[in-house]
Structure formats: C-alpha cells, structure tokens
C-alpha cells in the first residue's frame, strides 16, 4: 500500500448517526456538533436530511441547522430522499446533496416507500435539476453486501443499480454495508468488480460494525484502491429500517489507525476524540467507539 495514499473521509454522524437516536438533540447541540466536526478538518460533513419529519422526527429541524451554519454551507452535505428534498436543500443554500437507492426492492420499499426502479427514475431527475443549479450530487447503494429483507445480494444486481446511477450522470458512488454483514473478501471482490464495470466512477465505502468487521472491511476496500469513506463520530448510527444493525464505522477509531499507518486524512484525530467525548456527554450514553475511552483524559497525543 502506497505511503503517499490520501483518504477522503465524509463525516455522517450528524445525519446517519442521529437519525435513529432515541432522543432528539436540541438544534443548538446539533449545530455545535457540526461546527466542531468541521473544526477537526473534515472537508465534508453530512449535516442533516430533508426527510419528512413524520418518518425521522430527529431531523425535523434541518432548515434551522443549515441556517445556523450558512457561513460554512459549502462544506456541508445533505441527504435528499426525493425531489421535494432537493427543493428544500436548494432553498437552504446547500451545494452538495446525497441520494440513496437500495440494491434490493425489499429494503427500498421499507426505506423510501417505492421500488428501486422508481427511485432510480427520480434520482435521474434530481441529478438533472441539481446540475442545472451547480449542486453536486453523490449517491450511495444501500444493502450492497446483504439485505435484512431479501437476503444475499448478487454483485450483478449492485452493478445494475450503480450503472443506472452512472448513466444519470452521477460520478461518485458509495457502496453501503447497511446491516454490517460484509467480510473483507466480499468487499474486495465487489469493489474490484465495480471498478472494472464502471472505471470512471469514484467509488466510496460506507460500513457498519454489527459484526465487528468494519475496520477490516475498510482495509480491504483500501487495498482495492478505494480512498473515499464515510463514518460517524463515536460510531453512532444505524437505519430505522435495518433492524439489528449496529452503528457506523467509528470515525476517530478508523482515522487514528490510518494516521498510524502514515496515510494522510487531513483530520485532527485528537480534536475529533474530544468531539466524541463531548457528544457522549451530550447524549448521556456510552458511544460504541473505542479510542475516545482511552487515557489521557485530555488528549494531547493519540495513543498508538
């Protein structure tokens, strides 16, 4: 693995991490969390989602959060589940949105209340409208490694969905292990297949840690040339529509490892650990991450 390797890390804790948390954080606490993460050096933070509050009440204050962060809006990404979500994001001044579609109809119906085909059709329209307004669009394919409703997912199926996204003009696609069932060999095989099928796409990875394999899966993806990852401060997260799934790969745990390997990330890990500890106090609950629990209490250097 090249020592000159650089990794781009998208911090999704404020959205993916908080969307299924049992208690809703006050808006000022969310704003403070996003600002604190940006201060760590993240170039992109997924701040919220334009989902209907009926489905995810924890993110009902999306516009208020974005209004409070207008001076840093160019560093924020927002999940938009549909065209109405894009309209809301545009009105809020957002310059980068994320769209998602499942590799299976079973999960897509639970998550977005429509079929994969219908979602892909809407994403094409979203991408066209976003390009018209100079808004960048990133995409993810959820349950790419296994589905809680439809079971095993064939690589060919993932490729078909990803190809439809690429045909719609989307250049950055992340494959998500939404329920945390992937293993390193599967990760390597799927990313190699996708890179051969769609070499012009920039591929990213989004892992959950249900079986404790997220870090190993990250390294496997890294070996295939993937250098774009998503994770969550403290390891919080999980989809309301993926029963039993654990949180996202823990950002500070993974980034500390990458730093120790000499891989550049641009993120101040010591500062991120402090943010994780502050979030743990705010949530008044232990977080799944590990490194933030280590001494010294006030991080000066990150233990190897």
Give the location of each predicted region:
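Catalytic cores and adjacent flexible loops of soluble metabolic enzymes
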Residues: 1-304
């Amino acid at each position: 693995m090249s020592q000159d390797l650089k990794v781009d890390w998208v911090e999704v804790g404020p959205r993916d991490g908080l969307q299924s948390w049992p208690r809703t954080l006050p808006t000022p606490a969310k704003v403070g969390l996003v600002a604190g993460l940006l201060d760590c050096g993240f170039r992109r933070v997924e701040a919220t989602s334009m989902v209907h509050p009926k489905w995810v009440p924890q993110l009902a204050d999306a516009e208020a959060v974005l209004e409070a962060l207008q001076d840093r809006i160019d560093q924020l990404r927002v999940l938009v589940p549909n065209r109405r979500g894009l309209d809301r994001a545009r009105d809020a001044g957002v310059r980068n949105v994320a769209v998602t579609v499942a590799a299976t109809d079973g999960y897509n119906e639970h998550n977005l209340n429509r079929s994969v085909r219908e979602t892909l059709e809407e994403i094409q329209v979203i991408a066209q409208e976003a390009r018209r307004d100079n808004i960048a669009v990133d995409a993810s394919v959820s349950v790419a490694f296994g589905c809680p409703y439809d079971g095993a997912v064939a690589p060919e199926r993932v490729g078909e969905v990803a190809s439809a996204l690429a045909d719609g003009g989307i250049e950055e696609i992340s494959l998500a292990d939404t329920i945390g069932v992937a293993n390193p060999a599967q990760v390597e095989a799927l990313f190699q297949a996708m890179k051969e099928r769609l070499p012009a796409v920039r591929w990213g990875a989004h892992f959950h840690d249900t079986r404790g394999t997220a870090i190993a899966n990250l390294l496997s993806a890294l070996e295939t040339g993937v250098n774009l990852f998503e994770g969550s401060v403290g390891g919080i997260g999980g989809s309301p529509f993926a029963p039993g799934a654990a949180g996202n790969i823990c950002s500070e745990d993974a980034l500390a490892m990458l730093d120790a390997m000499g891989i550049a990330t641009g993120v101040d890990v010591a500062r991120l650990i402090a943010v994780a500890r502050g979030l743990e106090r705010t949530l008044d609950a232990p977080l799944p991450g590990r490194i933030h629990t280590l001494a010294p209490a006030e991080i000066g250097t990150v233990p190897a």
